[in-house]
Amino acid sequence: MRSSAKQEELVRAFKALLKEEKFSSQGEIVLALQDQGFENINQSKVSRMLTKFGAVRTRNAKMEMVYCLPAELGVPTTSSPLKNLVLDIDYNDAVVVIHTSPGAAQLIARLLDSLGKAEGILGTIAGDDTIFTMPASGFSVRDLYEAILELFEQEL
């Protein structure tokens, strides 16, 4: 089996185990993965995977402290580049709309507001995962749209 295919299989198995919400230690996760045929797995690899996928320890329904994945996919982490938090950018005759990962809209809006009128931004309104951006005087909505695309390195 190819290395990348084996890695994808490991990631699927790892995520499936965490969804069970019954593992209270990294050692338990290592043993469960080894039982599934991942002989080369060790505690340090499990630790790195827990960090990579944003796993946290929380109480399950039985009030036991267990590892689990965040409820929302796409939750921002300290290592998320901002451009990865922007999912979609679109516009109409009046406004540019930016869709972000859940919880990231206010962070992205603050960045856009800090760029200000020099970049064509009059202001932003942010919810949890959606931002409305208004163009400043002298800028068209299309100009603002293209500037934001360039900022977040998105494709037209």
UniProtKB/Swiss-Prot annotation:
HAMAP family: Arg_repressor. Its main location: cytoplasm. Keywords: Amino-acid biosynthesis, Arginine biosynthesis, Cytoplasm, DNA-binding, Repressor, Transcription, Transcription regulation. The lineage of its organism: Bacteria, Pseudomonadati, Pseudomonadota, Gammaproteobacteria, Enterobacterales. This is Arginine repressor. It comes from Salmonella paratyphi C (strain RKS4594). Regulates arginine biosynthesis genes. SUPFAM superfamilies: C-terminal domain of arginine repressor, Winged helix' DNA-binding domain. One of its GO terms (biological process) is L-arginine biosynthetic process.
